[in-house]
């Protein structure tokens, strides 16, 4: 199966519903613009969902787990075994995103794409196994062409399931020791940034560890300097879970499902997705600005204004999940407030 589907046309938001939602906002019992960005969020959701009364009750959260060969370079404060252990923790409901998904009433899908410490078959975990780990990007490409194709397809499979459940919002998350290094390398390659500007603390590195991480990224960029296309850069510098996120974001935009992007790693995937298929950008909201050093540069590259800034750097889709009540509030206000005529209140 080819990956040419990633270049297919994206859905187009409904301009008529956008206009209807804007008109309703102008009639609600408040000064124009008094609810700030909440008004714009409601209008965007109305256009995406093709209704003048949008909602964010049916949420699909997919967390993609995969290990990285670059972890062998000592770029994380945690051992590689943690990835597989966290997959088990997701399945048991003990991880942060599992708690948040329960609180939100959201559907949580965990996808095991390949971890060194494989927990095997687990309830509530989809096994889309590619390999125990990507390759070390300091020595060779992270993925073969076949592995990249399979990872992209794994993300698209999530969207097919989400669409069948009439999902109103998709949120992607990730788990993988070493994946901030891969995301930073991708960011450097796509934005012509210096590694020192993109390498951050990740799981908790000190200044010396961050400097070492930047050196590792420099080596990887030098090895893969001839990679010119976004897809080839993803293949050489990314990872299974990052590629799955790229596939999910593209498939969601093609299916007309809005996406709430999480933190640093998911934003790197979103940047790749928009470089591969520019129509994806119209379907993206950004949940928060993380504490990870390179996140601000990625957000600027997509002219993205995140909803929250809480100094988070956990990943797992946790920051995006925390922002979902904000979207629900925007919809509740839009749908539930009275108009001036309904309330018998004088308009300006």
From Swiss-Prot:
Keywords: Cobalamin biosynthesis, Glycosyltransferase, Transferase. One of its GO terms (molecular function) is nicotinate-nucleotide-dimethylbenzimidazole phosphoribosyltransferase activity. It catalyses: 5,6-dimethylbenzimidazole + nicotinate beta-D-ribonucleotide = alpha-ribazole 5'-phosphate + nicotinate + H(+). It holds the Pfam family DBI_PRT. GO terms for biological process: cobalamin biosynthetic process. Its EC number is 2.4.2.21. The active site is at 316 (proton acceptor). SUPFAM superfamilies: Nicotinate mononucleotide:5,6-dimethylbenzimidazole phosphoribosyltransferase (CobT) (SSF52733). Pathway: Nucleoside biosynthesis; alpha-ribazole biosynthesis; alpha-ribazole from 5,6-dimethylbenzimidazole: step 1/2. Catalyzes the synthesis of alpha-ribazole-5'-phosphate from nicotinate mononucleotide (NAMN) and 5,6-dimethylbenzimidazole (DMB). Belongs to the CobT family. This is Nicotinate-nucleotide--dimethylbenzimidazole phosphoribosyltransferase. It comes from Xanthomonas euvesicatoria pv. vesicatoria (strain 85-10) (Xanthomonas campestris pv. vesicatoria).
């Amino acid at each position: 199966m080819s990956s040419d589907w990633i270049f297919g046309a994206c859905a187009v938001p409904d301009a008529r519903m956008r206009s209807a939602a804007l008109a309703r906002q102008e009639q609600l019992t408040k000064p124009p613009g008094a609810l700030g960005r909440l008004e714009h969020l409601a209008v965007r959701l109305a256009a995406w969902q093709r209704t003048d009364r949008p909602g964010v009750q049916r949420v699909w959260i997919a967390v993609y787990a995969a290990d990285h060969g670059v972890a062998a370079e000592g770029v994380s404060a945690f051992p590689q075994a943690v990835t597989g252990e966290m997959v088990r923790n997701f399945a048991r409901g003990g991880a942060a995103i599992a708690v948040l998904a329960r609180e939100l009433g959201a559907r949580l899908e965990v996808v095991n794409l390949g971890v060194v410490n494989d927990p095997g078959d687990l309830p509530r975990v989809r096994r889309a196994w590619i390999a125990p780990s990507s390759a070390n990007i300091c020595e060779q490409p992270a993925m073969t062409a076949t592995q990249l194709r399979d990872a992209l397809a794994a993300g698209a499979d999530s969207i097919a399931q989400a669409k069948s459940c009439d999902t109103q919002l998709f949120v992607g998350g990730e788990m993988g020791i070493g994946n901030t290094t891969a995301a930073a390398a991708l960011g450097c390659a796509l934005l012509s940034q210096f590694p020192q500007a993109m390498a951050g603390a990740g799981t908790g590195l000190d200044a010396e560890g961050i400097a070492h991480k930047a050196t590792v990224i420099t080596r990887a960029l030098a090895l893969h300097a001839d990679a010119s296309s976004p897809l080839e850069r993803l293949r050489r510098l990314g990872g299974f879970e990052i590629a799955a996120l790229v596939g999910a974001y593209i498939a969601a935009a093609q299916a007309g499902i809005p996406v709430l992007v999480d933190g640093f790693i998911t934003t790197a995937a979103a940047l790749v997705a928009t470089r591969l298929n520019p129509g994806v950008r119209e379907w993206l909201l950004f949940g928060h600005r993380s504490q990870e050093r390179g996140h601000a540069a990625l957000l600027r590259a997509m002219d993205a204004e995140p909803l929250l800034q809480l100094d988070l750097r956990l990943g797992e889709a946790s920051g995006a999940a925390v922002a979902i009540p904000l979207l629900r509030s925007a919809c509740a206000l839009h749908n539930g407030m009275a108009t001036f005529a309904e309330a018998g209140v004088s308009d300006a």
